[in-house]
């Protein structure tokens, strides 16, 4: 329960204790020591995206083709770039409350290999060109440049690119936030929020909000922050005006594997001792809507292998077989074959919050005092340093530098244009199938791609969509009548 017994009214109630919710409470307290703050969320954080992540500080390895040529995608990339520069200082400050000093280990290897699709080569070409144009330090390396990248022959390396992305164990960061709350008078409620009530609007000031917890306690406040990812949707649905104006949140499910090396291998060497030399993230680019195969070392002989990704209308409580199958194959076939003898345990699923247009929901909604730190998809942990600082400024009456485009109450933002979105869907879908073992003879490649294009074009026609682009991970939501009816929202460009 709360650190202050009997308190019912707060200046700010933050619903959600993952990277964004906890990070925002941290920034609020840092910027105003007198503020009364409550953070609501189960301490186990089951289902939180951060708990199922490695985690990587993903910036350049996540850039997609055309990222900087599309205004909305460029602004989303800007969030990660700005956040990246804040992490070292953030870790230095937060280390006071950590079980051990926090620091980012910088450096990530992106691999192109024989198992990837042609789209992956183009994706890495784009990343390299984008870094060159912006004078971002990187290195294009030969296939044998990193001695511990030793895949099976079928996954032979074609090219390696070292980018400045980083890694840190996200669980350590969350643990430091928890200790900070206890030390700095932030009330943490180890419960779920089950009810949200909003009174009549008072212009500029907002009305009193009431947040009911699972145990029956009621918290009153002028400012509620919805930062519990897609779990927030059940609260949004209770406020019709909010539900009508804010794009629906979907469940971006993802799971990973905790990989460890048995003691006998540590003693005798196993298949290849080079696995003990892994000292940086190694990954492919995004594949089939997922964040590729990526291995995050923890510097103690343990690793995180991730990550699956699928956008669902309803959550599923356990990982899917095909998702874990692809990860295990990728670990051995594409990173180091010596992992054949490793031990694994599942982590997740965690649910990345995916808005109906896949763009983030940031800042104050059209209803005063209702705030969002949500919809960040796979970027929430990486972006949290910047997003939380800026939202805290605005809650406290200052100016935020977050893009106005991502205001929560809005029309759906187009993913590029219709034609470009369809092209990206076909490339991503085929890339996902290649990841699952698809091989087509040359004469069948174009007919296969044409069939996919025709299928997604029928979805556009069925929903009467003109030049608006559907994100490549969402056509199945538009295709299903039940899902579409629940998620339908006004679109820009139409």
Where are these regions (language model features)?
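Short hydrophobic core segments
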Residues: 13-15, 218-231, 388
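Dinucleotide-binding Rossmann-like beta1-alpha1 core, especially the glycine-rich loop
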Residues: 56-146
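N-terminal Rossmann-like FAD-binding beta1-loop-alpha1 element of flavoenzymes
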Residues: 10-38
């Amino acid at each position: 329960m709360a650190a202050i017994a009997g308190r019912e009214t707060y200046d700010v109630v933050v619903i959600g204790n993952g990277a964004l919710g906890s990070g925002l409470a941290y920034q609020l307290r840092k910027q105003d020591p007198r503020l009364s703050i409550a953070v609501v969320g189960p301490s186990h954080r089951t289902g939180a995206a951060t708990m199922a992540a490695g985690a990587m500080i993903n910036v350049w390895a996540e850039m997609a083709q055309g990222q900087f040529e599309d205004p909305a995608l460029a602004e989303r990339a800007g969030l990660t770039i700005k956040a990246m520069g804040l992490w070292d200082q953030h870790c230095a400050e937060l280390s006071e409350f950590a079980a051990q000093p926090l620091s980012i280990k910088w450096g990530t290897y992106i691999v192109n290999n024989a198992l990837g699709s042609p789209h992956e080569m183009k994706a890495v070409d784009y990343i390299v060109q984008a870094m060159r144009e912006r004078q971002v330090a990187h290195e294009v390396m030969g296939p044998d440049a990193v001695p511990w990248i030793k895949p099976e022959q079928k996954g032979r390396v074609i090219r390696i690119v070292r980018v400045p992305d980083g890694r840190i164990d996200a669980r350590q960061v969350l643990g430091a936030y928890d200790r900070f709350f206890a030390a700095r008078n932030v009330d943490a409620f180890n419960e779920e929020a089950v009810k949200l009530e909003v009174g009549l609007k008072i212009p500029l000031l907002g009305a009193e909000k009431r947040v009911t917890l699972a145990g029956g306690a009621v918290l009153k406040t002028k400012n509620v922050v919805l930062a519990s990812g897609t779990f927030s949707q059940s609260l949004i649905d209770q406020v019709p005006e909010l539900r009508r104006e804010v794009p629906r949140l979907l469940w971006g499910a993802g799971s990973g594997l905790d990989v460890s090396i048995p003691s006998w291998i540590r003693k005798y060497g196993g298949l290849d001792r080079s696995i003990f030399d892994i000292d940086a993230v190694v990954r492919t680019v995004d594949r089939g809507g997922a964040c590729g195969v990526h291995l995050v070392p923890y510097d103690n002989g343990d690793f995180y292998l991730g990550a699956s990704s699928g956008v669902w209308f309803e959550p599923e409580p356990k990982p899917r077989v095909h998702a874990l199958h692809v990860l295990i194959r990728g670990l051995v076939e594409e990173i180091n074959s010596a992992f054949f003898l490793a031990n694994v345990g599942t982590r997740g699923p965690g649910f990345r919050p995916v808005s109906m247009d896949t763009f983030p929901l940031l800042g104050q909604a059209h209803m005063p005092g209702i705030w969002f730190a949500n919809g960040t998809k796979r970027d929430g942990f990486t972006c949290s340093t910047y997003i939380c600082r800026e939202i805290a400024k605005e809650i406290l009456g200052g100016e935020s530098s977050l893009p106005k485009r991502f205001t929560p109450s809005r029309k759906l933002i187009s993913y590029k244009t219709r034609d470009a979105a369809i092209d990206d869907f076909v490339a991503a879908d085929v890339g996902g199938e290649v990841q699952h073992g698809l091989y087509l003879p040359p004469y069948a490649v174009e007919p296969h791609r044409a069939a996919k294009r025709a299928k997604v074009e029928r979805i556009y026609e069925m929903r009467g969509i003109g030049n608006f682009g559907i994100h490549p991970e969402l056509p199945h939501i538009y295709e299903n009548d039940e899902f579409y009816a629940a998620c339908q929202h006004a679109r820009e460009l139409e």
